[in-house]
Amino acid sequence: MLSPKRTRFRKQHRGRMKGVSTRGNRICFGKFALQALEPAWITARQIEAGRRVIARYARRGGKMWIRIFPDKPITMRPAETRMGSGKGSPEYWVAVVKKGRILYEINGVSEKMAQAAMKIAAHKMPIHTKFITLSQLTNG
């Protein structure tokens, strides 16, 4: 699973996900992509589940890119712990995804196969997504 090799600080504030994504909202590497339609935290496990699905389809001559990276630590406290005594320890990592962000890209496969792969990968995500192609973006 994806996680940073080292970070400057062990714990982070939760933050908020206002507005739309201004970075990472265009197709850069492949011809087909999966785009987020709502903001959410996507865990490293969910990213990995989507990657496995797409990799299975792209294996036959295709290439895929993961455009998000889980760099935010989420802390949790042990079960049945009283309030107070500081913040919990980091348990897992998430990627902060805003509306419009590209999650995955794929190239080297037919549009039909790419759409099938992205549809299954979309079911692994906790948000609504849409399948987009490079031609859709350039034509309008």
From Swiss-Prot:
Any one of the GO CC terms: chloroplast
Family, per entry: Belongs to the universal ribosomal protein uL16 family.
Gene3D superfamilies named among the record's database cross-references: Ribosomal protein L10e/L16 (3.90.1170.10)
Keyword presence, Chloroplast: yes
Originating gene: rpl16
Domain of life where this protein originates: Eukaryota
One annotated GO molecular function: structural constituent of ribosome
Matching NCBIfam families: rplP_bact (TIGR01164)
Gene Ontology biological process terms from the UniProt entry: mitochondrial translation
Annotated localization: Plastid, Chloroplast
UniProt-listed CDD domains: Ribosomal_L16_L10e
Record note on quaternary structure: Part of the 50S ribosomal subunit.
Protein name per the record: Large ribosomal subunit protein uL16c
Alphabetical UniProt keywords: Chloroplast, Plastid, Ribonucleoprotein, Ribosomal protein
Species this protein is from: Psilotum nudum (Whisk fern)
